[in-house]
Structures are given as structure tokens and as C-alpha cells.
A protein has these predicted regions:
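Solvent-exposed alpha-helices and their adjacent loops that cap or buttress functional pockets
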Residues: 23-24, 28, 64-65, 111-113
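Rossmann-like dinucleotide-binding cores of NAD(P)H-dependent redox enzymes
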Residues: 38-46, 54-87
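FAD-site-proximal beta/loop scaffold in flavoenzymes
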Residues: 1-57
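Short amphipathic alpha-helical segments
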Residues: 28, 68-69, 128-130
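A short alpha-helix-loop-beta-strand transition element characteristic
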Residues: 9-12, 59-69, 93-98
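Short, electropositive, low-hydrophobicity segments enriched in small/polar residues
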Residues: 4-6, 11, 18, 37, ...
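Flexible, glycine-rich terminal cap/loop adjacent to redox cofactors
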Residues: 57, 74-84, 89-177
């Protein structure tokens, strides 16, 4: 591609530097996806591309990485979004942990007979969600609910106003709170 000839600023890790609108250090040049080095996930690249297109069109938008879900597609699935306990400890951010076995979801039990699972939520002192981690099927399908709560900074009381259909595995988040 000849990117090295454009004089693009790089990060300490050697990735192409971008701002919140996916603009590089060279005017009129935008970057998204793996070469920016943020999450290396297809779903992140799609969102980065949307932000870049919005910037080109003059629409207000900004890339946020605080709620990018990650999924391990095993059986059972593992999914997480937001911070982990380790990252919160390193950042010195106070938090509380709520753990709830997936067996609290009747739908999970019916669809995963004899299988265990766990839902772990990490909450800030202001009752907003900092991170969520799920072990059990369909973790990949329900983790987005937690990501939305993180991105929108929903408090526990706001989260509890949401009506979840019953029975669904996703209502495990509401049960945990």
C-alpha cells in the first residue's frame, strides 16, 4: 500500500495513531481495524469504520472502546465486556462484585441441562456497571446487554426499569442486580 511513505504517526506499539474520529496524523487520511491496534476484532473495526465515515461526512461521532465485547466461541461460551477485576485493581478504582450462577435463569437450565455457568458483574460506587463476564451459552448473545449498560452508564436502578422477556437467558443480568 505504501503507507510507510505517507509519514503517518505511529503509537509506541507501532500501530497507526488515530484520534477519536479515526483521523490519522495526515489530514484526509483515516484508519480503522487491525492497523490501529485497539481490539483486533471485526466488530470493533466495523464501528471504527462507521465513525470514520461519519467524520468524513461531518456527522458528530466518537469512537469508544470502554464497552467492546470479547467472546471465546467454545462450548460453553465465555464472554466479557468492560473492565476486569485485575484492571480495576491496577487502576485503583473501587468496585463491588456480584456473582450469580447461570442456574438462576430457567431458560439457561432448560437449554443447558447438566451444565454450570456463571455471571459476574463489576459495579462502581455510583452503581454503574464497569464490567461483565459470562461463562455459559449463549454468552455471545447476551453480553451486548451489559455492553450497552456500560456505554450508556446505566445505574442499577435504571437497569432494573428495563423489562426483560421471560424466560430468557439475558434476564440473568437483571436477576444479578
Amino acid at each position: 500500500f505504501g503507507l510507510e511513505n505517507l509519514g503517518l504517526e505511529k503509537t509506541e506499539r507501532g500501530n497507526i495513531w488515530v484520534d477519536g474520529q479515526m483521523r490519522t496524523s495526515v489530514p484526509g487520511v483515516y484508519a480503522c481495524g487491525d492497523l490501529t491496534g485497539f481490539s483486533l476484532l471485526a466488530h470493533t473495526a466495523v464501528r471504527e469504520a462507521e465513525v470514520a465515515v461519519h467524520a468524513v461526512l461531518g456527522k458528530e461521532d466518537c469512537m469508544s472502546y470502554k464497552a467492546v465485547p470479547g467472546v471465546v466461541y467454545t462450548n460453553p461460551e465465555i464472554a466479557g465486556v468492560g473492565d476486569t477485576e485485575e484492571t480495576l485493581r491496577k487502576k485503583g478504582i473501587p468496585y463491588r462484585t456480584i456473582k450469580l450462577p447461570m442456574a438462576y435463569s430457567g431458560r439457561f437450565v432448560a437449554e443447558n441441562e447438566g451444565v454450570n455457568g456463571m455471571c459476574k458483574l463489576l459495579l462502581a460506587e455510583d452503581d454503574t456497571l464497569l464490567g461483565a463476564h459470562v461463562l455459559g451459552n449463549p454468552a455471545s448473545e447476551i453480553i451486548t446487554l451489559a455492553g450497552m449498560a456500560i456505554e450508556l452508564r446505566l445505574t442499577v436502578s435504571e437497569w432494573k426499569k428495563i423489562i426483560f422477556p421471560h424466560p430468557t437467558v439475558g434476564e440473568i443480568f437483571r436477576e444479578a442486580l
